[in-house]
């Protein structure tokens, strides 16, 4: 069900089944007055596939009955269904895209038949059948308790608009990129006994290698703690805000990997402070179209190290795109 004949993955525009144009990147959910009275959708049992944005923009939708033959719930399939408060997922489910229920901020109750061979639901969390991987969190939950069986939290798992508090279980050891990229998330706790990750100040980090996993903004600022040694695009999330006004990077940070500045974004009028006497090592695939150091803002460095940081920026072909200042 849905439009696919002329629309490709990654297109900015797409259509719902009623012809409403959807542009997720710019907040257009496809709503039209012509389908404002639709409150229930029943997908026939013969349907095996949904297309992206198929039922996006049904803002008054309250009930959905999905075909149990559906294996994948694609991106923005029910984007903007603001009154949808519960859903029973199909028992053939193998994959759910993180934006499948984007902006469904009332969706708190999720159920799934025990007959599903690949997944199960607990605490509003969609898990792998063995409980070790967290794939997705119901987007209407304000408080999330990650089950103790979970070890891996997948990309964008709890990146929604309403979550304010997350409690991580004892076995969580792997948190993927943007897992907790939520502007209202102010509080992340870790249960006692976790041997791999820890919290200090505004940071959730890996105790074994010092990689920052989640930065929690406070007053639009993030001060990275001295336990952190590495910023890595593959695992990093910023919680509590979209754009920081100040980011402090301590001397303990020795490595910057990939496009980490896209994970922790600082506003163009903001400031970044590098406190290390030596600039961190820059890693990542060589891509001339990508800059792996902060640009288009003010960057503050130790006065005695100004020349070193200038050489560092020059080596990245980025010196002309940054305003370097010294820490007083």
Model feature map: region roles:
Residues 7-20, 26:
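A composition-driven surface/loop motif
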Residues 1-12, 33-49, 58-72, 81-95, ...:
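Structural signature of tandem-repeat unit edges
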């Amino acid at each position: 069900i849905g439009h696919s004949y002329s629309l490709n993955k990654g297109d900015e525009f797409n259509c719902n089944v009623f012809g409403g144009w959807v542009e997720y990147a710019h907040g257009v959910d496809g709503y039209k007055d012509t389908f404002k009275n639709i409150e229930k959708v029943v997908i026939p049992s013969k349907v095996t596939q949904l297309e992206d944005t198929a039922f996006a923009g049904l803002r008054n939708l309250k009930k959905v009955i999905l075909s149990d033959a559906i294996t994948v719930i694609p991106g923005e399939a029910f984007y903007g269904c603001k009154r949808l408060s519960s859903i029973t997922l199909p028992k053939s489910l193998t994959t759910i895209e993180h934006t499948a229920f984007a902006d469904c901020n009332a969706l708190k109750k999720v159920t799934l038949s025990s007959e599903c061979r690949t997944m199960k639901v607990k605490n509003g969390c969609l898990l792998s059948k063995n409980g070790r991987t967290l794939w997705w969190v119901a987007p209407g939950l304000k408080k999330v308790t990650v089950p103790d069986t979970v070890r891996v939290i997948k990309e964008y798992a709890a990146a929604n608009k309403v979550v304010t508090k997350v409690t991580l279980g004892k076995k969580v050891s792997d948190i993927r990129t943007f897992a907790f990229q939520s502007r209202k998330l102010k509080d992340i706790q870790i249960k006692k006994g976790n041997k791999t990750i820890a919290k200090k100040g505004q940071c959730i980090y890996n105790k074994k290698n010092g990689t920052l996993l989640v930065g929690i903004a406070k007053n639009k600022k993030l001060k990275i703690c001295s336990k952190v040694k590495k910023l890595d695009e593959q695992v990093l999330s910023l919680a509590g805000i979209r754009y920081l006004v100040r980011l402090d990077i301590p001397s303990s940070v020795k490595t910057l990997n990939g496009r980490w500045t896209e994970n922790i974004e600082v506003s163009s009028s903001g400031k970044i402070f590098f406190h290390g006497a030596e600039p961190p090592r820059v890693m990542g695939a060589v891509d001339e179209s990508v800059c792996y150091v902060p640009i288009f803002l003010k960057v503050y460095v130790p006065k005695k190290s100004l020349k070193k940081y200038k050489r560092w920026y020059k080596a990245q072909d980025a010196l002309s795109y940054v305003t370097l200042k010294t820490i007083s």
